[in-house]
Amino acid sequence: TYYGKKITLKNPSRKGYTFAGWYTDAKFKKKIKTIESSAKCDYTLYAKWTKVNVAKVSITSAKNSKSKQILLKYKKISGIKGYEISYSTDKKFKKAVTRKNTTKTSYTISKLKKGKTYYVRIRAYKVDSTGKKVYGKYTSVKKVKVSK
């Protein structure tokens, strides 16, 4: 119980969800951020949560564009925090190299070996209210031969 003090409501955290605000009604119509110091009644507060859903990325092209490089292009997904790109010479990705935190819709993988075939896949991610990344599904695997 707090009387005479303004209370600023803090955001809670929940794995796999984003916090959408505090409400004074169960139907989430009356949003509240603070309880004023003049308030002289009890409040029942309702936390509104939104499940984090991440759409699947679509690769538009994957090709050996320059010497020992693969240029990847993929469609932009709105509302995401970034993309994670994995590539490997093994189609099961047992020894995959992963590049995280790219936000662009194209990416150049460099320092590859000429004559090798590489397998590439991408997935998008968002961040939940705990600060953890929530990943979408990987794209279908693209196969690219490095001949340049």
Map each language-model feature to its residues.
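Beta-strand-rich modules
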Residues: 109-131
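Extracellular Ig-like/FN3 beta-sandwich strand-entry sites
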Residues: 40-42, 80, 115-117
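Secondary-structure capping and domain/repeat boundary segments
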Residues: 1-51
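Short S/T/G- and acidic-enriched coil/turn segments that sit immediately N-terminal to beta-strands
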Residues: 103-107
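Pro/Thr/Ser/Gly-rich low-complexity, intrinsically disordered linker/stalk tracts
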Residues: 51-79, 131-148
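Extracellular low-complexity, O-glycosylation-prone stalks/linkers
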Residues: 79-99
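Predominantly extracellular/luminal cell-surface or secreted proteins
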Residues: 22-25, 85-90, 123-125
